[in-house]
Amino acid sequence: MNYLHKILTKKEASLRNFHLLGYQRHLNEIALLKLMKEVDFDVLRLADMMNTTEKAEPFFRRADMVTLNCDAVESFSEAFSTNPQINGLNRREICAYMKEIGLSENLKTFGVFNFNVYSESALNHQLIAQMLWYLIEGINIQRTHPKERSYDTFVVLIDNREFSFKRDTFSGLWYFAKGNDMKKWIPCSREDYENTKRGELNKRFLI
């Protein structure tokens, strides 16, 4: 078992939220993925993160700490990471996610791990530099966002139960609203709202 399994199974563990994003089933222990679901932590497949940031963005929006394993970035002519993978996020996708990480409202710590520092490929070093540039751009943009926000409210009725969604009028981002305390609202996507209208409520909203 790896370090993550040990953290999640320790009695002293006090993680309120944890998201494992971009996993590939054949590269992860089945027991770990099963454990993540048992403790109601979120897992998102690599396939769900490709081509668009919409499904993964809500997990970054209020993240306090984000760690990036460079194994999640695809390698081609020369290894980008110390454990290179042929499948992974491409260059444009990883830069888009770095910007989303920087846009987090609560980001305090960010770490990049397993970058192949011994790579002789100039493109690999350019990519890691651009990734950090997009991270900083996201942070700078977040600092310009207004402190006071207004929201549009959307109510969905399922089996006589009302579920409220909020849309930030400035950013266009969506939240599942639990009461009036904005800190308890759950970041979500427009797709979550559309699915709820069809009677498919994301189970993480009920935890």
Residue spans for each PLM region:
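Conserved alpha-helical scaffold segments that buttress catalytic/binding sites
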Residues: 1-112, 116-207
